[in-house]
């Protein structure tokens, strides 16, 4: 994990509203189907893909929005877009294989949640967090916005 400063950039794609409890049950989970839709629409895997978490109702426990897509313009009509704010983020990283993307993502999020439960951990701003998937390098990075830096 490292502290990084990111400049603002725009991500375009498909958006859903969900909540953590719904994502724990296969019959109500929406994030996996969202990614399936995006990759079906794109047909060719992009070099970089983004999963953006925003509009937190009450931290990560209530409703929040997830946008899955690409930096810049999405190649299909009626796409949603948002600007990831520039600022200070904690960056958590892991390697993955094509067959282990979901498992790697869940394990890395578990690492994030455990880190922020520690005494003295920086305060999350709950404005915008995002996942960055590198198809070529098979890397996953999760960026968590933090306050006071």
Q: What does each model-found stretch correspond to?
A:
Residues 1-149:
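A solvent-exposed interaction/effector surface
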């Amino acid at each position: 994990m490292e502290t990084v400063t990111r400049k603002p950039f725009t991500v375009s794609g498909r958006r859903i509203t969900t909540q953590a409890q719904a994502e724990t049950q296969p019959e109500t989970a929406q994030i996996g189907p969202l990614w399936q839709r995006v990759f079906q629409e794109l047909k060719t895997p992009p070099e970089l893909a983004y999963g953006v978490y925003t509009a937190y109702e009450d931290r990560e426990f209530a409703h929040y929005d997830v946008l899955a897509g690409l930096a810049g313009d999405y190649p299909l009509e009626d796409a949603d877009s948002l600007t990831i704010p520039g600022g200070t983020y904690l960056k958590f990283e892991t390697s993955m294989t094509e067959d282990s993307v979901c498992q790697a993502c869940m394990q890395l999020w578990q690492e994030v949640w455990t880190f922020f439960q520690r005494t003295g951990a920086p305060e999350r701003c709950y404005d915008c967090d995002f996942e960055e998937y590198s198809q070529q390098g098979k890397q996953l990075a999760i960026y968590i916005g933090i306050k006071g830096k």
